[in-house]
Each structure stands twice: as structure tokens, then as C-alpha cells.
């Protein structure tokens, strides 16, 4: 199985990339110029943005089967998995953005009762950032390209999209549908290619935001290059996401828990940034969990061969890395009992789902993110010591999963272990929540997106304050000449008083309720006296 993108894709000439970026920037400024001459720019902009999102929706809808077929060609992903995790999720996201966009684009009123601002009007509006770069990964080549693209469109930006060259069939279909969807020329530009093309995009320094999804290693390169031009970036990375089955988990629910864990660990052949990377099981329930693993695995995969609907590793290097990791472990292994692979598995890039147990923290599988269909299981005794080990070895995972019937245990884990997200009682499924933020913390990335949060990510919040001219009687003390009397007035009118003492205890008094009104009266009196 070979995914050499250069044999299928027409890579964008590096010499043309600067021109493409300039087209994107120019279209944004021309669009804003036209809007500025409208009687109601915000209303016109809303109509434009919603129209583009509607075009994107039908482009995906009309090409859904073609996209699913392309993903199958790229890495043998079965149709149900692509429908569940890519096309349906994406179309729902687009429809949700269209629906909530009128509310999102509406400015927010802010109030401040202190004298300089009490008669003015303060609003916070969300404006487009400008031209943005989206660099998409291979593991969900459609969703992780078009979901941020939809958010960027909703926020009124122009976009340069760099699909993954490792899923070339999907990249071709995505470019074709974007080209034929009826978008204005310059609104969405596609750059096809690999390292050279991506490097040129990052080096141009002309973007207003860079949105990257991928590995922490490349993410650090993206951040470093973005910093040179002070370009903000969002990094959606990964890491070793732990899963807990705690002491106080009902044994009767072990099978359900394992089904949900295996769904996340082996779906997409483990090539998911939020896959359960390893499983931590309390010693009291460990034997029952291990015993049930084989049963659930065989229920999922009653037979396993080259015809099985199981996603392949993306290319031979990923396959070889996964096999080497599995071969290097010192643990015991559980695989589907009826494996029959007659073809060359290296050519197929097919790695069977593998559970590894009887291992410790020093096992090779515990050194870095596996990103393969392998699930190491570690037995633990003390929860606090286990959390200490996670913090020491693999702090700030993208997500943590907890299977426990004790809120005390859940609180202990949540309070101590930082993570981008957390799911209690399931795995992976949280990424499908339409209007919840998805993103990492620390080494698993920064920034987030998803519905409202995606719109915010691709927008800039701008404060607009409008001051009337008739209220100068509340502002005169800021003008020269200065005096001790004005200083006292400023302090009395502007300086808030604490409602707590030096020990942090709250104190009660009427002053905080009446000081503002008294200040306004005093200012008016002094102003009248000074003017006479």
C-alpha cells in the first residue's frame, strides 16, 4: 500500500505559492472595501457568509460518496466509519454554523458604571482576522480540513487550505469540489504538496492566523515559524491520552467499558489524536478486565483477514513503526483469535488490533504516543501515585478517559491531571458535540474550535467605545491644570473600595452602594462651582 501523493496529486509549484497567498489577501481587502460602502455592512456580510457556508454544505453533500470512496482508496477506511466520523459530523457542523451565525455576528453590549464610561456606549464586535492558513492532517482528511475551513468562512475570512499529501485521493476530491462549488475566486485557495510547499506557506509571513493539526514535533516548527512574523496560530496536536478503570467501578459494566475503550483505541486503526493510548486498571478489577478483553475483541472481530473492514496504517513507515513497537514490548498480547492474513501485511499496511498487558511504565509502548491499533494495559494500586506518574511522564494529554462510579475518584483525577478534554464513561465520542470547545493544553496544543468556539478562534474581538460630548462635566478633572482637589475627586469617584479586610474576610457597608451616586453629585457640584 503506497500513498505517494506526488504520483496522484499535482503539487502546487513552489514559485506560485506567494502569488496564491497574495490573491487570498487581496480578495479579503476587496471584500471589506465593498462592504464598507453598504448601508448595513454587517447585514450584507452575514448574508455573504451564510451563502458560502450553504455552498460548502451542498458541495460536501453532493460529493459524499466520492469522498468516502477516496478515503477508502487512501487507507481502506470502511464506509460506516467515514460516514460517522467525517461526512455526517462535518455537514452537521456546517448547518449549525449557518443556524447560529446571526447570533454570533451580533455585537455584545458592555456596561461600566464608573464616571468616565457611564454615559458612553461600549460594544464588543467580532471582526474577521483576514487571510488564514489551514494545514490539515491525514487521519481525518475531510473533517479536519473542512471543519476549521467552515469556521473560518463563518468568521468572514479568506482561506488557503493545505490538505495532507498522505491522503492524495481525498485531497484531489476536496480541491475539485471547492473549485466547482461556486465560491468567488480568491475566497478559498488550495495548495497541494508536501514539506517544500508547506514550508513556503509558513515562510511567507503573510497570514493573519495559522491553524495546524498534526504532531507535536511539526507543531513546534509551525509555531516557531509563525512567531517570526508575529502570526497567531492554533495547534491541535496529540499525546498519550490515559484511560482509567478505577477501584470503584462496577464489575458488571466491564464489558460495556471495554467496548467503548476498544471503539476509541482501534477505530481508524488507532490513528486518532484522541485515541485511548493506554489503559490504567486498579488491581482489584485487573484480572476481570484482562479476562474480558479477549471476549470483547473476538466479538468485535470474529475473524480478521485482509478482507476485514479495518482501516490500514497510512503508509509503510507508519506500519513498520507500529509493528516494531508491538514487537519490542515485554508484555503479553491479546489479538483476535481467528487471524488469517495470507497477503503481504507490509504491502497491506494492516496491523491487527493488539492488547498488551503485564507491563510497567518502562515498557517501550509507554514512551511516546502509539498512534496505532495497540492498547497497553497497566495495573495500578494507588491512584495518587499513578497520577504522579502521568504528570511526570506524560503531562497535559489531549484528553483523559475515566470509568469510575465514585465521584470522589473522578474529582481527584480531574483536579490533579490537566488535559484538553475529559470524558467520563465513554471515549472519543466527545468530539462530536457540536457546540463544545475541542483543543489541547500544554504539549497537546493550544486554541480550540467547534461551533461557537471555532467562530471565536477565527475572529478578533474588537472593543468600540462611543463617548458623547455633553457629559464633559464627568471628565473635566482629567484636564490640566492639575490640583490636589482634582486628585481627591478622582480618587473618590474612580477608586473602588474592597469589600474584604486584609485577612480576606468579607465586610459589609453601604458605601459601595452609594459612593458612585455621591461621586456624580459631588463632581457636578464642583464643576458648577469652578465654572462660575
UniProtKB/Swiss-Prot annotation:
Matches recorded under Pfam families: Aldedh (PF00171)
EC code(s) of this entry: 1.2.1.3, 1.2.1.64
Compartments where found: Lipid droplet; Mitochondrion outer membrane; Endosome membrane; Cytoplasmic granule membrane
Positions with a binding annotation for NAD(+): 214-219
Record carries keyword Transferase: no
Primary location recorded for the protein, binned into one broad class: other
Catalytic activity: an aldehyde + NAD(+) + H2O = a carboxylate + NADH + 2 H(+); hexadecanoate + NADH + 2 H(+) = hexadecanal + NAD(+) + H2O; 4-hydroxybenzaldehyde + NAD(+) + H2O = 4-hydroxybenzoate + NADH + 2 H(+)
GO MF entry, a single one: aldehyde dehydrogenase (NAD+) activity
Transmembrane segments: 134-152
Keywords linked to the UniProt accession: Endosome, Lipid droplet, Membrane, Mitochondrion, Mitochondrion outer membrane, NAD, Oxidoreductase, Phosphoprotein, Transmembrane, Transmembrane helix
Gene Ontology CC annotations of this record: cytoplasm; endoplasmic reticulum; endosome; endosome membrane; lipid droplet; mitochondrial outer membrane; mitochondrion
Membrane topology: Single-pass membrane protein
GO biological-process terms attached to the record: aldehyde catabolic process; aldehyde metabolic process; sphingolipid metabolic process; ubiquinone biosynthetic process
PANTHER family xrefs: ALDEHYDE DEHYDROGENASE, ALDEHYDE DEHYDROGENASE TYPE III, ISOFORM Q
Extra facts: Present with 2930 molecules/cell in log phase SD medium.
Stated family: Belongs to the aldehyde dehydrogenase family.
Name of the protein in question: Fatty aldehyde dehydrogenase HFD1
Native source species: Saccharomyces cerevisiae (strain ATCC 204508 / S288c) (Baker's yeast)
Amino acid at each position: 500500500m503506497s500513498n505517494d501523493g506526488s504520483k496522484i496529486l499535482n503539487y502546487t509549484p513552489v514559485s506560485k505559492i506567494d502569488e496564491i497567498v497574495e490573491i487570498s489577501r487581496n480578495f479579503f481587502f476587496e471584500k471589506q472595501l465593498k462592504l464598507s460602502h453598504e448601508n448595513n455592512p454587517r447585514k450584507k456580510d452575514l448574508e455573504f457568509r451564510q451563502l458560502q457556508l450553504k455552498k460548502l454544505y451542498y458541495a460536501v453533500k453532493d460529493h459524499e460518496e466520492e469522498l468516502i470512496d477516496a478515503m477508502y482508496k487512501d487507507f481502506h477506511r470502511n464506509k460506516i466509519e467515514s460516514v460517522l466520523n467525517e461526512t455526517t459530523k462535518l455537514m452537521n457542523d456546517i448547518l449549525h454554523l449557518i443556524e447560529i451565525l446571526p447570533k454570533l455576528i451580533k455585537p455584545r453590549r458592555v456596561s461600566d458604571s464608573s464616571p468616565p464610561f457611564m454615559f458612553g456606549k461600549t460594544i464588543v464586535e467580532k471582526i474577521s482576522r483576514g487571510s488564514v492558513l489551514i494545514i490539515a492532517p491525514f487521519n481525518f482528511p475531510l473533517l479536519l480540513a473542512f471543519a476549521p475551513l467552515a469556521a473560518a468562512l463563518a468568521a468572514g475570512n479568506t482561506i488557503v487550505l493545505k490538505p495532507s499529501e498522505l491522503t492524495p485521493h481525498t485531497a484531489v476530491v476536496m480541491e475539485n469540489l471547492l473549485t466547482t462549488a461556486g465560491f468567488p475566486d480568491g475566497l478559498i485557495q488550495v495548495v497541494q504538496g508536501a514539506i517544500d510547499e508547506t514550508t513556503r506557506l509558513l515562510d511567507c509571513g503573510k497570514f493573519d492566523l495559522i491553524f495546524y493539526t498534526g504532531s507535536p514535533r511539526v507543531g513546534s516548527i509551525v509555531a516557531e515559524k509563525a512567531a517570526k512574523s508575529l502570526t497567531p496560530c492554533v495547534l491541535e496536536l496529540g499525546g498519550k491520552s490515559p484511560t482509567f478503570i478505577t477501584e470503584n467501578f462496577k464489575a458488571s459494566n466491564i464489558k460495556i467499558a471495554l467496548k467503548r475503550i476498544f471503539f476509541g483505541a482501534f477505530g481508524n486503526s488507532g490513528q486518532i489524536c484522541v485515541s485511548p493510548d493506554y489503559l490504567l486498571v486498579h488491581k482489584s478489577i485487573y484480572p476481570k478486565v484482562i479476562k474480558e478483553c479477549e471476549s470483547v475483541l473476538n466479538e468485535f472481530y470474529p475473524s480478521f483477514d485482509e478482507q476485514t473492514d479495518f482501516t490500514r496504517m497510512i503508509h509503510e513507515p507508519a506500519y513498520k513503526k507500529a509493528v516494531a513497537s508491538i514487537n519490542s514490548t515485554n508484555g503479553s498480547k491479546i489479538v483476535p483469535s481467528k487471524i488469517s492474513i495470507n497477503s503481504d501485511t507490509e504491502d497491506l499496511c494492516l496491523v491487527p488490533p493488539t492488547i498488551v498487558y503485564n507491563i510497567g511504565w518502562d515498557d517501550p509502548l509507554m514512551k511516546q504516543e502509539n498512534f496505532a491499533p495497540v492498547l497497553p494495559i497497566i495495573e495500578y494500586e494507588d491512584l495518587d501515585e499513578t497520577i504522579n506518574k502521568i504528570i511526570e511522564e506524560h503531562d497535559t494529554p489531549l484528553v483523559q478517559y475515566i470509568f469510575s462510579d465514585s465521584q470522589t475518584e473522578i474529582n481527584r483525577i480531574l483536579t490533579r491531571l490537566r488535559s484538553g478534554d475529559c470524558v467520563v464513561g465513554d471515549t472519543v465520542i466527545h468530539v462530536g458535540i457540536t457546540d463544545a470547545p475541542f483543543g489541547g493544553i500544554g504539549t497537546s496544543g493550544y486554541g480550540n474550535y467547534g461551533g461557537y468556539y471555532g467562530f471565536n478562534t477565527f475572529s478578533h474581538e474588537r472593543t468600540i467605545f462611543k463617548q458623547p460630548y455633553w457629559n464633559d462635566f464627568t471628565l473635566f478633572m482629567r484636564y490640566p491644570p492639575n490640583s490636589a482637589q482634582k486628585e481627591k475627586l478622582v480618587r473618590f469617584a474612580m477608586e473602588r473600595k474592597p469589600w474584604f479586610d486584609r485577612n480576606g474576610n468579607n465586610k459589609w457597608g453601604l458605601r459601595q452602594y452609594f459612593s458612585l451616586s455621591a461621586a456624580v453629585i459631588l463632581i457636578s457640584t464642583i464643576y458648577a462651582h469652578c465654572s462660575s
